Amino acid sequence: MINWLSKNRQTVARGFGSVLALVLLAVLIQEQGDGELFSAFRRVSPGYFGLALVVLLVSRLFAILRWHILLRSAGVKISFLRSVELTFTGNFSSNFLPTTIGGDVVRLTGAMQLGYDRAICLASLVVDRLVGMAGMALALPFGLVPLFALSSGAAQSAAFSALLQKGMDFVRRTFESLSIWLKKPSALFGSLLATLGNQAFIYLMVYFLLLGIGHRLSFWLVAGMYTLSYFVTLIPISINGLGVQELSMTFLLTSLGGLTESESATVAVLVRIIFLITSLPGAYFLPSILAAMNSKEVDER
């Protein structure tokens, strides 16, 4: 038992972090009563929920396009359909893996087994994530400005110092990983445009959910709040951001958006549900990926 805990201490710690975040979320909801939460869920418009689902699916296609552009520009002969299959399979698998990059590991494994260049695929996944983070960073001021307006000077100073350190680390990792694509600025620009499209539709998904419970907030405020929540979930203290994402979104929607705790928790939970639903095509594509892997192994024999 002790040996198992020693080998899996990071997973155990993340599991504890998720449980703690979910408990804190439950406490917030309990303060207003369970009835308020169920009432907020009943108020969600099916039409707006459907729109939110559709726009998130569109955002997934932009995310796939971002990675596909990087792969093709590096000389990997991969079809867009294969990129779709690998990405959705990774998204689906990430629901059951302990970190937010679990889906990337699945994508890399699948690409390698299908015979694509390992080094380029690994580098493309790193750059894919970095470009995604760069796009998110562009929307960060829309969340930081209203958040700092609520915070004390000491909190602002601490937050700025932490963000500055993160930014310096981000720039260093970016230049280390961009060796191939720095010579292909058009590919980098295309992937950045794709990630901006991905973000716009994610923000639109949250915007529609808010409309679905009768709240019309500024689109840019929604973008800022979601971006702040995104960066919080990158902290490796939970399983795939579970609990931490919901808790941070609940706090931001309550503090900056003016929603009640129950309404904020409803939106946060629905965001998680919609991401889960839109990952389900990965379950459909998984058999075809496995079949392609088996076919590749047979050909090599």
Residue ranges and their predicted role:
Residues 90-91, 128-132, 271:
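Structural signature of transmembrane alpha-helices in multi-pass secondary transporters
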Residues 103-112, 239-254:
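Re-entrant/interfacial helical elements at transmembrane boundaries that shape
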Residues 126-145:
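Hydrophobic alpha-helical transmembrane segments of ABC transporter permease domains
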Residues 72, 95, 112-113, 211-212, ...:
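Transmembrane helix-loop junction
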Residues 90-99, 227-242, 246:
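Transmembrane alpha-helix interface/packing and boundary motifs in multi-pass membrane proteins
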Residues 1-88, 136, 145-234, 259, ...:
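Predominantly cytoplasmic-facing regulatory/coupling regions of multi-pass membrane proteins
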Residues 96, 106-110, 122-125, 135-137, ...:
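Hydrophobic alpha-helical membrane segments of integral membrane proteins
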Residues 80-85, 99-104, 114-128, 259-270:
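Membrane-interface alpha-helices at helix entry/exit sites of multi-pass transporters
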